[in-house]
Amino acid sequence: MVEVSEKPNTQDDGVSKQENRNPASSSSSTSDKEKVAKKGNSDATKSSTPEDLDAQLAHLPEHEREILKQQLFIPDVKATYGTLFRYATRNDMIFLAIVSLASIAAGAALPLFTVLFGSLAGTFRDIALHRITYDEFNSILTRNSLYFVYLGIAQFILLYVSTVGFIYVGEHITQKIRAKYLHAILRQNIGFFDKLGAGEVTTRITADTNLIQDGISEKVGLTLTALSTFFSAFIIGYVRYWKLALICSSTIVAMILVMGGISRFVVKSGRMTLVSYGEGGTVAEEVISSIRNATAFGTQEKLARQYEVHLKEARKWGRRLQMMLGIMFGSMMAIMYSNYGLGFWMGSRFLVGGETDLSAIVNILLAIVIGSFSIGNVAPNTQAFASAISAGAKIFSTIDRVSAIDPGSDEGDTIENVEGTIEFRGIKHIYPSRPEVVVMEDINLVVPKGKTTALVGPSGSGKSTVVGLLERFYNPVSGSVLLDGRDIKTLNLRWLRQQISLVSQEPTLFGTTIFENIRLGLIGSPMENESEEQIKERIVSAAKEANAHDFIMGLPDGYATDVGQRGFLLSGGQKQRIAIARAIVSDPKILLLDEATSALDTKSEGVVQAALDAASRGRTTIVIAHRLSTIKSADNIVVIVGGRIAEQGTHDELVDKKGTYLQLVEAQKINEERGEESEDEAVLEKEKEISRQISVPAKSVNSGKYPDEDVEANLGRIDTKKSLSSVILSQKRSQENETEYSLGTLIRFIAGFNKPERLIMLCGFFFAVLSGAGQPVQSVFFAKGITTLSLPPSLYGKLREDANFWSLMFLMLGLVQLVTQSAQGVIFAICSESLIYRARSKSFRAMLRQDIAFFDLPENSTGALTSFLSTETKHLSGVSGATLGTILMVSTTLIVALTVALAFGWKLALVCISTVPVLLLCGFYRFWILAQFQTRAKKAYESSASYACEATSSIRTVASLTREQGVMEIYEGQLNDQAKKSLRSVAKSSLLYAASQSFSFFCLALGFWYGGGLLGKGEYNAFQFFLCISCVIFGSQSAGIVFSFSPDMGKAKSAAADFKRLFDRVPTIDIESPDGEKLETVEGTIEFRDVHFRYPTRPEQPVLRGLNLTVKPGQYIALVGPSGCGKSTTIALVERFYDTLSGGVYIDGKDISRLNVNSYRSHLALVSQEPTLYQGTIRDNVLLGVDRDELPDEQVFAACKAANIYDFIMSLPDGFGTVVGSKGSMLSGGQKQRIAIARALIRDPKVLLLDEATSALDSESEKVVQAALDAAAKGRTTIAVAHRLSTIQKADIIYVFDQGRIVESGTHHELLQNKGRYYELVHMQSLEKTQ
């Protein structure tokens, strides 16, 4: 029999756990994945191209191939820049047109200044040759200086409108893209998610949408302004003298060739970088979401290395991209300076030939200077546009995908009066992601209306597939599912799902209140629109029916209690009961219970099962169960084996047949020794217990002040709780978050990331300084050139000679700039990508270093931390690499330019320099505002990204509740709030940006007016004047450019502070600390001495109250009791996930809080309820149990044999090399659990901790695995937490917990004879043939 995975939909983790996923050919699938990832195909499906899909599905008949193809195929969208604006509204486009015109008009201001400059040059020559009087000269000078002031005012207004406008439109359009993307994600069929990592969705919705926003916001305005400057400058040049302008225009062709050639590589590299980061994001999401597992096994180092594999790939492509941009910028500068040389050389010839005058040449040359210089401002933005296009292609490929099974579609019929008869007719099913495995073959089954049908069978037999097909998560490849005789494919999908309520094994709650979580069950029902009062009554009634009301009322905020992300503040049993209340609140026609009580303890299960039995009366119910005691009373029990129906009938009929069902029953039977006590008495006792729990007031059940036995249950689950040794945590948290760092501290901190590159970085700084000195040198050449062209006709011979010399100097300067700019680009590419690589790697390691308390904080949800890794590290590059090089370069320009100006004309230079502090102040003030804005804005995007991540990772729950619309409304609300906040902030900061950019005109007005006066009086000659003015123009422009980087610098400062905070956080339980005694050998005595413990999230409610417990070496003890009584907390404290409030936990008489935590944990092994596997092979996952990368095969085989998984692994084509998929999605729950057990056994631990280790297994697997665990426990101290009491009968001592204390202990037989709590629990779980 082919063993296939059991549970496709039990865990809403975004990478759906496919019950079909026998890893039989996972290696082929993975090689396909790798192939396509390397090609850089679209985001989610690793095999979305038609060729790849056809190859994978080639072995299937054509009609089956088509059905699977529809569920997997993703269109390959060829995005262009225009595609990014596809969601712009008419108003957006009108606004865009206005702000574009403003940007273009702002760009024309500088070329207009060249006209004034040329005119003044002619005037200066006239006064020098005494052609005009001093008064006439003064009048012309004053008038032209005022024109400069008017130009400055116009520039200020236009730049302000442009900057605010583009940021607003960019944010508005990106907001729509974010919403459309999430909307598209929520419409996809589940097969799409089987190929998608949850981390990828987070990366797309945060990092990639941010890239789009960056590419369509203020950078568009800056680019349009630069291009406008370029073109208007050349137009002015052509108008003044077309021949010279035409010759200078030849450089445009050279620039286009350089930009065009290099940008192809830039786009490709950008795309490949994003692909690698997406894959890394998936790994990070896997690890962070299962942090307790990683902590218990000490696998942080191995998992960090796995993450780094993807980071290295991203670094490689990122370096290529940055290097190409550096070379492109160097080439542009070389072309620009060569153009000056060409212009002077040809201009001198035309002047000597009498074809033009000095005024026109100066005008044209200056226009070419400014026009060519402005094109340099376009180059840095090309990366942002290229990244935006790459990100857009990925996002739009998902948005454009037409889902094969679309819950958002209005197509399909509805049935007026649903009766609830379900029929599976000739069903054959293959999961799209595992086309090699047939999960169901020839299934014919009728589920009569109003009756309860139970599905049982071994793990992976196809039971949960029935739920998947009825909910239409998948389409079968042949056959049909009928509801009241209608094929469900013809029915409207949303309507269909609204007729069905699903409770799955691992329920998903949403990060809102208990009341709102239950209310979600009313979506689409007639009761949805009732009054608030009626809805409240329904919700309370449903909670009572699900045995949840009492524990809810015991919580401080009752129904208004926030359950935390995915319900993490509640225990498994509590979450399950809320999920049941949610399912029954709408009084559905069809109820699907996919192991609905498996997470409950026996006490809760008895009552909830009674509630479910009552709830299922009169409605069609399909129950999937491993625990057979829950389905004895079903109208029909269907036994499914290997994807086919083996037998069906009632409990009694099947027991009489003595077939597969009886084997399952025998495997689960508890051998009670009850003497002569009759069965009737036993049943009577059970009924009494149930009625007692339902009717006795909550306080008396709990003997005193703590209402309901589950008051602390919300605090009792190891995999969900906040932790730290005392309530001081809340104060410590506020201190952490309030820590402020100075700019110097942050710069030193970021520089630390580039320590290994410090030598080549110094070279980079050297080249940046040389590049920066280029412009002041060019100012000297320019002033010399103009002076040369001012010579009278009598000296035209000298004029030609000097012009040739200075033209050659320009050519030399161009070559030097080519070398220095390119070298700087290459060096900073290496440095900045290394910085991003180390920042991601170290911050991931810093996260993994943290104790469990850190991950329990609401702001540290999986989505938020994954988003932090993808977004914030990118922002750090705002003070590294290319940006830092450019800042150093333009700072050098400013300093050298002003120094040269002072050296040649100190009076004029001092007047001009007096304006520079104002320029700097404008820029730095804007930088400060943006840093503040960034801190606020980031929080909002983090919460919306975290929300989107939560919704997509719970996609099956969202789909079955038809909650898509509600998710979208909340998400859009969060985006709208963010947009309003950011607009106010941008409106302020843009004032300063516009001021800093337009202030140069006021400087020029002052410089011309004052310098002209000096020249008119004969104090300065033309060379001094032109040199000072030229230096000031470029100097002040450089200052403006520094501050155009301040958005990046603002983001970087905010990001650096977050990183510093993370790195500075030293956890109380620190895995990196060498402190504490190291244990060489362990005997295995565990003691709890008067342990008190409570979680800081609910500091007012104790979890453990004076726990005293001793486990002797080699002893097997079991902890049982109601949900939330502190059993799993005990395991958590043994693992030292948390420290106790008072009292202590001791091993061999030593307080574990004084031991070295790594050394101590190396002697423990944990097998928890939800097994966690990571991407990689089966062998990799088993080896995570030890800290070595390689072990002899014999040891690996022995561990797997002991866990009863060896034979299954060897039956796979690739054996131990089989890839398990994201979160082990290629395997069934049972298979994953056995690999997790092998991982625990390979450690050869002295202490074995089993937290409901067999609860995910069916009876058949459980029996064998339990035998393996029993064998493994020999010679080891073993602590087992169990709901299923059959698994712990053989324990040396069984401790019964209640309210954080031990109320009873002894062996199985002793406790049965006592007829106390344990006896009640056993009684309720006993499975006997009904008489």
From Swiss-Prot:
Residues 422-667, 1086-1324 form the ABC transporter domain. It is found in: Cell membrane. It catalyses: itraconazole(in) + ATP + H2O = itraconazole(out) + ADP + phosphate + H(+). Residues 97-387, 764-1051 form the ABC transmembrane type-1 domain. GO terms for cellular component: mitochondrial inner membrane; plasma membrane. It is a multi-pass membrane protein. Residues 1-51 are annotated as: Disordered. CDD domains: ABC_6TM_Pgp_ABCB1_D1_like, ABC_6TM_Pgp_ABCB1_D2_like, ABC_MTABC3_MDL1_MDL2. Belongs to the ABC transporter superfamily. ABCB family. Multidrug resistance exporter (TC 3.A.1.201) subfamily. This is ABC multidrug transporter MDR2.
